């Protein structure tokens, strides 16, 4: 497990991007529970921490693919016309185990 930040660095209903061991991850605080997933959208490499956090889902700022932060699964894919134009849609994100020790957030990368 790698220390990423302090719990206080990511307030409730917020998310931030971090680079851990060369990998870009998104860390989100959903009602005091922390979730970590890949920070890059699998559709066209949008930076998910710049997107929108809605409950336990993140919406990509580029083409609005929506991912579940708990499972990493695609909840809503990009529009069909966009999938046709770009050769495919969004794929599930990798999730990472998160542990809170005192005020430290640790992620299993």
Which residues fall in each region the model found?
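Short cysteine/histidine-rich metal-coordination sites, predominantly Zn2+-binding motifs
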Residues: 55-61, 74-83
């Amino acid at each position: 497990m790698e220390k990423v930040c302090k719990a206080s660095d990511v307030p409730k209903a917020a998310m931030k991007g971090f680079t851990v061991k060369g990998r870009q991850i998104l860390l989100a605080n959903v009602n005091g529970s922390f979730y970590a997933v890949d920070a890059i959208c699998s559709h066209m490499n949008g930076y998910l921490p710049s997107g929108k956090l809605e409950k336990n889902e993140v919406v990509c700022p580029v083409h609005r693919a929506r991912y579940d932060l708990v499972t990493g699964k695609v909840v809503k894919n990009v529009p069909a016309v966009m999938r046709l134009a770009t050769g495919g849609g969004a794929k599930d994100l990798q999730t990472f185990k998160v542990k809170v020790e005192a005020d430290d957030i640790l992620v299993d990368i």
